[in-house]
Design a protein with these regions (language model features):
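N-terminal nicking endonuclease/strand-transfer module with a His-rich metal-binding environment
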Residues: 1-144
Length: 144
């Protein structure tokens, strides 16, 4: 069974950077989380990276642009979800597919996100970082 944790992000730039970061760091902002999720040193293969309505390379700029378009640049900037699996529980492909399905169902095609599935520890884990502002209608994300 997967373990998940969601962290609200106040600095989108740092969270994005964290997700794609080549060194293991602690998420501080959205830029950090996005950088870390797409970190190729941790994914080993580019097939374990995905994004929705943004590109991995420009995710922070794309998300910031959405915020500016809807005049919602303050407050929580995004969210960083970590989904971890026990050793041997899933293959990297399955873990990544589960993360994509979770993001699609949870965000309903309304929020930009990036996913990186990492293989650098004893357990496979995925990072999902998404924008707090909807690219469809400008509404802020609210969890139930």
């Amino acid at each position: 069974m997967a373990y998940t944790s969601v962290i609200p992000v106040r600095r989108l730039d740092r969270a994005v950077k964290y997700v794609m970061n080549k060194e293991k760091t602690t998420a501080v902002s959205l830029q950090d989380a996005l950088d870390y999720a797409a970190n190729r040193d941790k994914t080993e293969q580019s097939c374990f990276e995905s994004s929705y309505t943004c590109t991995l390379e420009t995710a922070f700029a794309d998300m910031r642009q959405t915020k500016e378009r809807w005049h919602k640049s303050g407050g929580v900037q995004g969210y960083h979800l970590v989904q971890s699996f026990a050793a041997g529980e899933v293959t990297p492909e399955l873990a990544h597919q589960i993360a994509k399905e979770l993001a699609d169902r949870m965000l309903g095609g309304r929020y930009q996100y990036v996913i990186g599935t990492h293989l650098n520890t004893g357990h496979i884990h995925s990072h999902i970082v998404w924008n707090s502002v909807s690219c469809v209608d400008g509404k802020k994300y609210r969890s139930n």
